[in-house]
Amino acid sequence: MARVTVEDCIEKVENRFELVLLASHRARLLAAGAPLTIDRDRDKNPVVALREIGDETITADDLKEQLIHSMQKYVEVDEPEAETVPLLSSSPAAAAVAPQSSSDDAAVQFDRMSEEDLLRGLENLAPPVETDDEGE
């Protein structure tokens, strides 16, 4: 690797360790068939990756985001939460349906189970069926 290439990249990515992570990730992408943003000039993938970062044909922020996504095992999906719609009608029927007060919420009680009952319930569960995975 040319020292000039690394010095150009340090101006774009200040942390050398982060630069190594980003350049190696980009080099792996190039090896996997990602399109080049600059001419190769008989350079290997790590040098091409550093030249792309140094010439800013690919941004360090984009590479960082791609690196994070490639390392994630589970992708969190934000699902919209169901919203409750308040009643707009002031009719007597609507007043009968509407909750009376928040003190009713405090009166809600749940069934309690002793530890012995819980253990007896767990003992009655069927054990999982074992499969023979050695043949694969």
From Swiss-Prot:
Region feature (Disordered): 79-107
Keyword Transcription in annotation: yes
Source species, domain of life: Bacteria
A molecular-function term among this protein's GO annotations: DNA-directed RNA polymerase activity
Keywords from the UniProt entry: DNA-directed RNA polymerase, Nucleotidyltransferase, Transcription, Transferase
BP GO annotations: DNA-templated transcription
InterPro entries: DNA-dir_RNA_pol_omega, Pol_omega/Rpo6/RPB6, RPB6/omega-like_sf
Enzyme Commission identifier(s): 2.7.7.6
Reactions catalysed, as given in the entry: RNA(n) + a ribonucleoside 5'-triphosphate = RNA(n+1) + diphosphate
Thylakoid listed as a keyword: no
An example Gene Ontology CC term for this record: DNA-directed RNA polymerase complex
Pfam families the UniProt entry points to: RNA_pol_Rpb6
Quaternary structure and partners: The RNAP catalytic core consists of 2 alpha, 1 beta, 1 beta' and 1 omega subunit. When a sigma factor is associated with the core the holoenzyme is formed, which can initiate transcription.
Purpose: Promotes RNA polymerase assembly. Latches the N- and C-terminal regions of the beta' subunit thereby facilitating its interaction with the beta and alpha subunits.
Name of the molecule in the record: DNA-directed RNA polymerase subunit omega
Organism annotation: Methylobacterium radiotolerans (strain ATCC 27329 / DSM 1819 / JCM 2831 / NBRC 15690 / NCIMB 10815 / 0-1)
